[in-house]
Amino acid sequence: FTVIEGARISAIRMKFECVADIGMNSVLAEYHRELLEQYDLLFVDMSYGGSHADIGNTEAHLKNYMQKNLRPEGGLWSGPGVRDFLTMTTDQVRIGQYSIASDEGGSVLKRQVTDRMSDYPLGAVLEKISLGTSEIDKYGLESRDVGAERSRYEAEIEEIGRPVEEVEEGVFEEVPLDNPADAANATRSIGVLNMVLEDASSVSAVKVDANQYISHRSRMQGTGMCREAASLTGEPNELVFQVYLFEKCGYYGEEMEKSLLKYQIEYILAGKNVDWQNLEYVARRLLRWREVANVIYILSDSAKVAEAHAAAGALAAVLACPALLEPVAYTILFAWAYVESLQDVKTLFSGGRVPIMKTAADWKTGINSLKNVRGSLTADSGGRGLNYKEYLQIMVFLLNQEKRTFRAMDIMEMDIRRTPGNAAFRMDACFDTYEAELSVSSRFGYAYEMTRLYGFY
């Protein structure tokens, strides 16, 4: 009897170990297929394609898997006359810890991305982004307000006032300024895309309800990052995640055919609910950067400064009132830098390159372009410096980490929901590691418990 009971106890323990392993791996085998196919991510969806996401669903799946393996139907050891030597039952399955993709600001998601791209050569990308961000910071492209500087010169012109001339005896009229800068500045209200694109109507106008997505709604919470997974695969790397985004998301000129929003990187940057608005945001930001850089350059170019003074000095109002010469010349220089910046944005949207800081050889527009801004802009796919994607990479690098991460998850939700059976898909319903507390018993009076941690790492 003692020998038989000892064998029974050993068999129960062994079977418990095997069944727990089979069950917990079976849960992981239910990973979300679309998430893997589209984004190379391994997560289990707690809703299992439904609208109710809860860890209780996974507990039920795990318990079912265990019970089926404890008491299998059919096979060699079942049927009439066959006695179960163990007769085991799953008493309890409790998942106390589980790492949801959005936990800790999305660190769970980014840990997996970092692990999957651990061999990616980052050196060249890092160097280009570092040099770009350093130049942007050095020259104040994000912080300098050239609009306010331009306004000061315009205010000075207004303070000086227009000269008057006698048009007939006793009748005096202001001499019109006819400042060429005014014609250029009048286009500022038109919108950058309308100025730089050959056919602005071709821009996507897809609109989404942003409140449906993870960055805008309340989120389910797991128990945070699995420290064991992080210790084995490494902590999340923001630069790796950024490189991953450019592999998995579309942007202007490189749109993803099956995506809901066509300008996904632009959405990550702007967070607007309409494609057009996201692209316009990026275009305006590019224009602002380029305008600061071009103002810095043009004010250092003595030939262009002299050209602007000559153009200002030829105006009748300036001839009649020499005090207007300096402020008018500077408004011309600022307007010229603005037109050059529009040309830069058009070049970038045409597949060309533009250096962050220019030399004389990089300058494209002439002073006469101020009178016919749109007509003077040309599509240019050449040049040196950075292209549109590389400017976007710098913008994404400068973006707040949380916005970058959760807007990226918005994109994932948008596109996964377009696939069959995933209409209610949520990133905050997906986990990649979990710890289960398991207990079984036998009708022979034995009971055992164990805790196991399983996951994708």
Predicted segments, located by residue:
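Alpha-helical assembly-interface signal, strongest on the long, hydrophobic N-terminal helix that forms
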Residues: 1-53
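Long, compositionally biased low-complexity segments
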Residues: 33, 41-457
